[in-house]
Curated annotation (Swiss-Prot):
Quaternary structure annotation from Swiss-Prot or TrEMBL: Homodimer.
NCBIfam families recorded: cca_archaeal
EC number: 2.7.7.72
Gene Ontology biological-process annotations: RNA repair; tRNA 3'-terminal CCA addition
Gene name as annotated: cca
Coiled coil segments of this chain: none
Name of the featured protein: CCA-adding enzyme
GO molecular function: ATP binding; CCA tRNA nucleotidyltransferase activity; metal ion binding; RNA binding
Catalytic activity, reaction form: a tRNA precursor + 2 CTP + ATP = a tRNA with a 3' CCA end + 3 diphosphate; a tRNA with a 3' CCA end + 2 CTP + ATP = a tRNA with a 3' CCACCA end + 3 diphosphate
Protein task: Catalyzes the addition and repair of the essential 3'-terminal CCA sequence in tRNAs without using a nucleic acid template. Adds these three nucleotides in the order of C, C, and A to the tRNA nucleotide-73, using CTP and ATP as substrates and producing inorganic pyrophosphate. tRNA 3'-terminal CCA addition is required both for tRNA processing and repair. Also involved in tRNA surveillance by mediating tandem CCA addition to generate a CCACCA at the 3' terminus of unstable tRNAs. While stable tRNAs receive only 3'-terminal CCA, unstable tRNAs are marked with CCACCA and rapidly degraded.
Positions of Mg(2+) binding: D61, D63, D112
Additional detail: A single active site specifically recognizes both ATP and CTP and is responsible for their addition.
Keywords carried by this UniProt record: ATP-binding, Magnesium, Metal-binding, Nucleotide-binding, Nucleotidyltransferase, RNA repair, RNA-binding, Transferase, tRNA processing
CDD domains xrefs: NT_2-5OAS_ClassI-CCAase
């Protein structure tokens, strides 16, 4: 029988690492908010990702979003987002997704500073990354400490078999998908049990628009 607590003890962040992440993230958030005030921007820093949800594994990274009011034109949040990102990560590199963003390291921790639009439940997204703010809120409202460790176990398992990660080279299980599966099935073992019995495609799509082997509806979508 697998000793899950022993597995978690090897992959869960140490208290020292958690303290380092907290100090670095608090400092960056303070700097971003100060810059936003000085530039009279209606925007604020928000910590998102697995660290914000307490499902992070050891040697993880930090995702910090700059959430702008929804009436800003896209070119403004792109320009200001890059300016702020470079200001708080001096040696950062520009990367490009739906919005350009700045990625770099501080104190040995990989950090992404990403601009987005503010979004509340029921709002239509303006850009794809906007929902990330709601993902954090949703997961934190549906996972307790035990559930967070169950997510960690699912992440560890999917990493070990090479199916963790939503990027094009993998098309696997994202961290958010792992969180939603544990919320739905309550435990790592229940998730594995469900997929071990699933036949063919796992699909919930009344309009039959998708051909993916598995489809899970994002609960924060209106």
């Amino acid at each position: 029988m697998i000793d899950y607590q022993e597995v978690l003890s090897r992959y869960r962040p140490t208290q020292e690492e958690e303290n380092r992440l907290r100090i670095i993230s608090d400092d960056i958030i303070r700097k971003i908010n100060s810059i936003c005030r000085s530039r009279r921007l209606r925007a604020e820093a928000v910590i998102v990702g697995s660290y914000a949800k307490g499902t992070n594994l050891r040697d993880g990274d930090l995702d910090i979003f700059i959430a702008f009011d929804r009436d800003y034109p896209e070119e403004i949040i792109n320009t200001e987002g890059l300016h702020i990102g470079h200001a708080v990560i001096p040696n950062g590199r520009e990367k490009y997704a739906e919005h350009p963003y700045v990625s770099g390291e501080i104190g040995g921790v990989k950090i992404d500073v990403v601009p987005c639009y503010k979004m509340s439940f029921g709002d239509r997204k303006i850009s794809a990354v906007d929902r990330t703010l709601l993902h954090t809120e949703y997961v934190n409202g549906h996972l307790d400490e035990k559930g967070r460790d169950e997510v960690r176990l699912l992440k560890i398992f999917t990493k070990s078999i090479g199916v963790y990660g939503a990027e094009a080279r993998t098309f696997g299980f994202s961290g958010y998908l792992c969180e939603l599966l544990v919320i739905r099935f309550r435990s790592f073992e229940n998730v594995i049990r469900y997929f071990s019995k699933a036949k063919g495609r796992v699909l919930i799509d009344p309009d039959e628009r998708f051909r993916d082997p598995m489809l899970l509806i994002d609960p924060v979508d209106p």
